[in-house]
Amino acid sequence: MFCIQCEQTIQTPTTKGCSFAQGMCGKTAEVSDLQDILVYALQGVSFWAEQGRKVNVILDEIDQWAPKAFFATLTNVNFDPERVIEFALQAQDYKQQLEETVRAAATVTNTELDELSPAAKFELPTEADQIIALAPQAAVNRGHETQHEDVIGLRLLCLYGLKGAAAYMEHAHVLGQTDKDVFTEYHQIMAWLGTDPTDLGELLDCSMKIGLMNYRIMEMLDTGETNTFGHPEPSQVNVKTIKGKCILVSGHDLHDLEKILQQTEGKGINVYTNGEMLPAHSYPELKKYPHLVGNYGSAWQNQQKEFANFPGAIVMTSNCLLNPNVGQYADRLFTRSIVGWPGVAHIEGDDFTAVIDCALAQEGFKHNEIEQMITVGFGRNALMAAAPAVVEQVKEGNISHFFLVGGCDGDKSERSYYTDFTAQAPEDSVILTLACGKYRFNKNQFGDINGIPRLLDVGQCNDAYSAIQLALALAKEFDCGINELPLTLVLSWFEQKAIVILLTLFALGVKGIYTGPTAPAFLTDNLLAIIQEKFDMRSIGNVEDDLKAILAA
């Protein structure tokens, strides 16, 4: 195996990347290799999907399936080798279907097709042991023996950025949002990466294309969520537990949460959100259910202890999943969609009867805890509605600076930086936050500035779109560029969704972003220097020094 896609990957003076029997995330070498094979097979699918555009052959089923399958290879999503093989064999079938259809259409129209890429030539056998033997051909760092390390690093930046974008494409698709132009660009980029490109300039340009494409995808996802569930509105959420039977919903999929709420009505079951599902409590069409009672736990890296202590059924709708056998709750865990763990029950379709039966069979919480409320729901509409008041407070000198502090959380001790940063931020500053990094500080008290809360929870990681809209509105109001605003982004990264959001911000021209806790291992020192120079990206350091530098600028 060789995997270097997440922040927790092995980094020593002599080794970068997980290359032993098991990755730091818990996936086995077998699963890692199978995921590489799946990705390479998907690049072959995209080759033929791109060729199909030349002869007006577009198969919607394949367009919608391909990003979903790619999502299955994202960090902490699918650890089940059988499921990954199923995806890979389906990719092979779809590639053959596309090839036959496209070649036939090209013959009729006398259209010349491109020479087959290495990924398009990649063929899978049907037996598992024969499939795994192909792993060296499909390794994400293939060619590293002869190619410059900067080439490999930029290929991976593009691959991992596109993987994050694919995840958001699937989230949007679940809510009925697709875009043919986005599918076309996705296939173009995926197919091109399957040619093993070597030009550094073209690879850098590709990363910016991915960032801009993801901006459109985040807009689609925002549309899907608000059209389906209404616009988020500031709402109080209880972060303590209530007596009764219970179901915990984790991941990102609001559609699944809605189905669970509908199917548990009148059954005496309390439903809790976990992790990135916290913003659900601010959507009118979700918070209307009285048995959506609160948010349980914290960020994903704490789930093995928190899930073990949860006396009910647990549904994992997307990333991030950890080994459930550690806390001995695998028999109460259910996976959905692209998520998988060997031996854990998987729910196909929208029937959650098995989850409900499991919840009713568990003890549930035996008493009520004393309520503790936090506020969520400062989505796009809420932020835009507050913009005039915010502008007034800035002009009157009551608000001096804005910080966007958030992103993916993780278990490294260095991540306490984000807790300390928000605690030490000036009292006349406003802090926007999103994604699970918020759990580092979202239960702390920050007060308000003349009625404007100092901590504004924007939502999930993809709701960076809402924060961008606020920044654009403020820039217009103050007649300046985004980079001239008293606004600083302080981001934490862990996996590929964070990578693509960073690429989106770069592509939109946002500079001076602070990132941490460590730099991506797949980026060489030379590439980091290029990115730092081009985008003024900065690594987090000492909180006091960073704040001093930010406020002095």
Curated annotation (Swiss-Prot):
One of its GO terms (biological process) is response to hydrogen peroxide. [2Fe-2S] cluster binds at C3, C6, C18, C25. It is found in: Cytoplasm. It holds the Pfam family Prismane. GO terms for molecular function: 2 iron, 2 sulfur cluster binding; hydroxylamine reductase activity; metal ion binding; peroxidase activity. GO terms for cellular component: cytoplasm. The modification Cysteine persulfide is found at C408. Its cofactor is [2Fe-2S] cluster; hybrid [4Fe-2O-2S] cluster. Keywords: 2Fe-2S, Cytoplasm, Iron, Iron-sulfur, Metal-binding, Oxidoreductase. It is an enzyme of class 1 (oxidoreductase). Catalyzes the reduction of hydroxylamine to form NH(3) and H(2)O. Belongs to the HCP family. This is Hydroxylamine reductase. It comes from Aliivibrio fischeri (strain ATCC 700601 / ES114) (Vibrio fischeri). The gene is hcp.
